[in-house]
């Protein structure tokens, strides 16, 4: 299937590693020009070079890529990212609003600073990124926005209280925005990864193992056992789902929360 993304400009937030990097690679493989960003100039530059090398090794065309060091949790970071991406590649047609996620913690006893940081880096950054692109997308009559959240928006995950709360707020914002923008050819969706093999998942499991006094392998085995697919997801599997939501083929899909989780979430809606 041709996703119809050749010549489109994509801005993928928090894309120096993990799911963000996998999404950037998937969109570049479909022919989109891609702006990557991270707080670390070194890491985002290395990610861009990795993507370029992978595409070249596959024998495919390498679209324009740009690596931008930006702190999306700052007041001006989201606008800076979108502006710099547009300056380098052209107006942004596709936004993938990703972030590293707030630190884990139980509901009781989380301090004000933890909540403030969670709000700024998870909800506010995503909302600001969308605000920075939505006007241009609607004016041009085409656009794709995909917010990356978590299956916790469908089924809360113990120990990820701030993440669950803030990502659920992102879902509410995304649904409202999808209602407003659909008439102008802009789709707004949310992709909710389940247990996917990334460094963040490894860190969460390591914390659980330490707290429970058990081995990391025990935690991993228990986590895999409750997934109907019987294994953790791969970043490229998640990225393929996001690329589809960004495609011409998904032009009539908007306001959706799509779990990419191997069947982990048991809810009917």
Predicted regions, residues:
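Short C-terminal tail/terminal secondary-structure segment
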Residues: 155, 231, 243, 254-269
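Conserved glycine-rich cofactor-binding loop
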Residues: 9, 14-18
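Substrate-binding pocket helix/loop in short-chain dehydrogenase/reductase
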Residues: 106-119, 145, 223
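Short, small/polar-rich loop/turn modules that mediate ligand/substrate recognition or access, typified
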Residues: 96, 182, 187, 253-255
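Alpha-helical segment proximal to the catalytic Tyr-Lys
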Residues: 135, 179-180, 251
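Catalytic loop of short-chain dehydrogenase/reductase
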Residues: 146-169, 174-183, 195-196
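Conserved glycine-rich Rossmann-like NAD(P)H-binding loop of the short-chain dehydrogenase/reductase
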Residues: 32-47
């Amino acid at each position: 299937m041709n996703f119809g993304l050749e010549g489109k400009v994509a801005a993928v937030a928090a894309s120096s590693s993990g799911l963000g990097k996998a999404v950037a690679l998937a969109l570049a493989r479909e022919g989109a020009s891609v702006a990557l960003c991270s707080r670390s100039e070194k890491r985002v530059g290395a990610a861009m070079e990795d993507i370029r090398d992978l595409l070249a090794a596959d024998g495919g065309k390498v679209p324009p890529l740009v690596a931008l060091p930006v702190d999306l949790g700052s007041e001006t970071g989201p606008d800076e990212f979108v502006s710099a991406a547009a300056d380098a590649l052209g107006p942004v047609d596709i936004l993938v609003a990703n972030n590293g996620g707030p630190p884990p913690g139980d509901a009781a006893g989380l301090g004000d600073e933890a909540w403030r940081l969670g709000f700024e880096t998870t909800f506010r950054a995503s909302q600001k990124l969308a605000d920075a692109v939505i006007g241009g997308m609607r004016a041009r009559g085409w656009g794709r926005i995909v917010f990356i959240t978590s299956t916790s928006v469908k089924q809360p995950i113990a120990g990820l209280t701030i993440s669950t709360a803030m990502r659920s707020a992102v879902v509410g914002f995304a649904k409202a925005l999808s209602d407003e923008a659909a008439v102008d050819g802009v789709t707004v969706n949310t992709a909710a990864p389940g247990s996917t093999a990334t460094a963040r998942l490894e860190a969460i499991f390591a914390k659980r193992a330490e707290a429970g006094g058990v081995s990391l392998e025990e935690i991993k085995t228990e986590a895999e056992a409750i997934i109907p697919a019987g294994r953790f997801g791969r970043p490229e599997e998640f990225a393929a789902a996001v690329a589809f939501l960004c495609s011409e083929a998904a032009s009539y899909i908007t306001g959706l929360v799509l779990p990419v989780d191997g069947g982990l979430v048991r809810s009917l809606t």
